[in-house]
């Protein structure tokens, strides 16, 4: 089930889920590490990365190098709604967003890709992706010198001994997929 980091932690802590995959800014690692340690959750790093610009392969941004975030002001940003630090409201927790007047908030990943396919002037910040997904949705993932936010994906689960075989198989698959993504 897809959700924000704090929602995912709640599912593991209170709703009986066995695993959660968190994504957060590396600078917030101490917050999550302490939060999980206090609650008896084990954290297993999956991947560190910088967000890249994801856009339509034939759109204007596919051919442009963005050196300053203000260059994105005339484009439409597709934004996942989980964009604040846990427990913070408004300004302090919001990071590197460009133009509040040109945003589309979309929670579900397939819908985000569909918009990027159909709106060549749209973009979003994205994690590394499998090449087959980029090709399927006619998208390109570009490094962006103007955005250097370091992110971390971490698997979280109750620290109660060994994982079940099917859970360990899932963890192994996550590591394999993370290693083979387009970065």
Protein language model regions, located:
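Central regulatory/effector-binding core of bacterial HTH transcription factors
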Residues: 1-33
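Short hydrophobic/charged patches on amphipathic alpha-helices used for structural packing
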Residues: 6-13, 43, 69, 113
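Hydrophobic hinge/microswitch elements
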Residues: 13-18, 23, 82-141
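Secondary-structure junction motif
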Residues: 25-30, 62-63, 68-98, 164, ...
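Flexible hinge/capping segments at coil-to-helix
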Residues: 35-77
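Short beta-strand->loop
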Residues: 37-48, 127-128, 136-150, 159
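A late-sequence structural motif
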Residues: 140-182
